[in-house]
C-alpha cells in the first residue's frame, strides 16, 4: 500500500470520526436539555405533592365521624 493511499485512507477515517463525534456531541447536548427539563418537572411535582400532603394532613387531624 503506497503512502498516498494510506494518507488518503487516514484522512477519510478522520472525516468519519469527526462526523461521528459531532453527532454524538449534538445528541449529548439534546439529552442534557431533556434532563434539565425533567429535573424542573420533577421539582414541580415534588412541590405539588408536598402541598397535597399538607392538605391531606389537615383532614387526617380531624376526629373520625361519630359512626366509627
Curated annotation (Swiss-Prot):
S-S pairs: none
One Pfam entry name: SlyX
Coiled coil spans: none
Family assignment from sequence similarity: Belongs to the SlyX family.
Protein name: Protein SlyX homolog
Organism this protein belongs to: Ectopseudomonas mendocina (strain ymp) (Pseudomonas mendocina)
Gene, per the UniProt record: slyX
Amino acid at each position: 500500500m503506497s503512502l498516498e493511499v494510506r494518507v488518503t485512507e487516514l484522512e477519510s477515517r478522520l472525516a468519519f470520526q469527526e462526523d461521528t463525534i459531532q453527532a454524538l456531541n449534538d445528541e449529548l447536548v439534546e439529552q442534557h436539555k431533556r434532563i434539565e427539563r425533567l429535573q424542573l418537572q420533577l421539582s414541580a411535582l415534588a412541590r405539588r405533592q408536598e402541598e397535597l400532603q399538607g392538605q391531606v394532613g389537615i383532614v387526617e387531624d380531624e376526629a373520625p365521624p361519630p359512626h366509627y
